[in-house]
């Protein structure tokens, strides 16, 4: 312990990267949701909506790399990949929280967006001829209940928690990669 030098705080880098990730994923996610909500119901629209989560997740995983790069370059320091993992984890969790807040703010700006999105998705599913009507009715009821649950306080908190877990994990990994690339310890 006595040989360890005091390292500067990584929190400014974590917060900066988390805000960047949250804003970019919010904008991309909103763009895709607006596209679907403004489209005619079709299977193509359902496929596009299915890409929303993977695309925003791929964008979201850069947070750990951004934060570790920022921290390493700002202070011209090296640190182990464990510290990179920690930086990435915190970046992902904070990005999820900020993204959740962004989403709720946007619900105040356009309160009917998610309703229009749900209507388009359900309409697209209703057009599917390959599913028997009895199964289709059950699935549509389940979709409607899912959309209602997502707009409740419990659903919102559950969504933020899931997002924090996913973004925390992928950024833990990308933080390790960032530490290896930008802050490899001297040997």
Where do the model's predicted regions map?
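Selective recognition of hydrophobic, aromatic-rich stretches within alpha-helical transmembrane segments
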Residues: 44-71, 108-111, 152-176
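Alpha-helical transmembrane segments of multipass membrane proteins
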Residues: 21-32, 59-63, 95-103, 166, ...
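Transmembrane alpha-helical insertion/packing segments
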Residues: 1-73
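Short, charged juxtamembrane terminal tails flanking transmembrane helices
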Residues: 1-7, 180-187
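Alpha-helical transmembrane segments with an aromatic anchor "belt"
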Residues: 70-93
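Membrane-water interface at transmembrane helix exits
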Residues: 28-37, 68-72, 99-107, 174-183
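Functional transmembrane-helix hotspots
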Residues: 98-133
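Short membrane-interface loop/juxtamembrane segments of multi-pass integral membrane proteins
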Residues: 125-151
């Amino acid at each position: 312990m006595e040989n360890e030098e005091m390292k500067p705080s990584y929190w400014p880098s974590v917060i900066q990267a988390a805000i960047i990730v949250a804003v970019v994923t919010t904008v991309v996610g909103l763009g895709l949701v607006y596209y679907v909500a403004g489209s005619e119901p079709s299977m193509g629209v359902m496929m596009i909506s299915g890409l929303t989560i993977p695309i925003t997740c791929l964008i979201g995983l850069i947070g750990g790399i951004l934060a570790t790069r920022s921290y390493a370059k700002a202070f011209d320091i090296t640190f182990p990949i464990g510290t990179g993992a920690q930086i990435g984890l915190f970046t992902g969790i904070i990005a999820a929280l900020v993204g959740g807040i962004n989403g709720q703010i946007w619900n105040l700006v356009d309160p009917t967006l998610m309703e229009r999105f749900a209507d388009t998705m359900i309409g697209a599913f209703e057009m599917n001829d390959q599913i028997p009507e009895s199964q289709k009715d059950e699935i549509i009821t389940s979709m409607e209940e899912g959309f209602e649950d997502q707009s409740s306080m419990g659903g919102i908190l559950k969504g933020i928690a899931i997002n924090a877990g996913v973004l925390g994990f992928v950024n833990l990994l990308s933080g390790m990669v960032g530490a290896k690339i930008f802050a490899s310890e001297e040997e």
